[in-house]
Amino acid sequence: FQAPVMADYFTHFSCLLDVGTPEHAARALDLYHALSEEGASEEPPSEGFLLSIQPEHGGTNLWIRDDITGDPQRVIDFVTRCAAAFHLTSRWGFQYASSCSKPRLDGFGGGAHVLDLATGETVDWIYTDGWLAEVLDGGDPDA
């Protein structure tokens, strides 16, 4: 008998959020640090994400990405806070990929999420694991 090898699960993403001005981008870093402190106090701590202002993306764009793995809900929370603080009004979205260090049936997938920044409401979202199971069971692929 050989015990199963533990697998590591990861969530990857990389996206931009345009906050309108370089001043907003600088203030967004403060919002990020506050959210990171909140995540660190959770049990278990949130994986969070990395944030920076990169010259190649312009001074108003925030580069949001995972650090080995990340938490899409933390990204959504952060973007919603930025939208409220900086009065952003467009739609914004990102996609993410779920992967695993070992071949596992539940180890791969992904999703996407679209927000209306003016209202902070979700426009639509999809998570491929749930979607695939539903369609394979005869459900509506567009539901």
Over which residues does each language-model region extend?
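Glycine- and charge-rich intrinsically disordered segments
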Residues: 1-3, 143
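Charged interaction segments
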Residues: 32-143
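Short, extreme N-terminal segment that most often corresponds to the first beta-strand
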Residues: 3-35
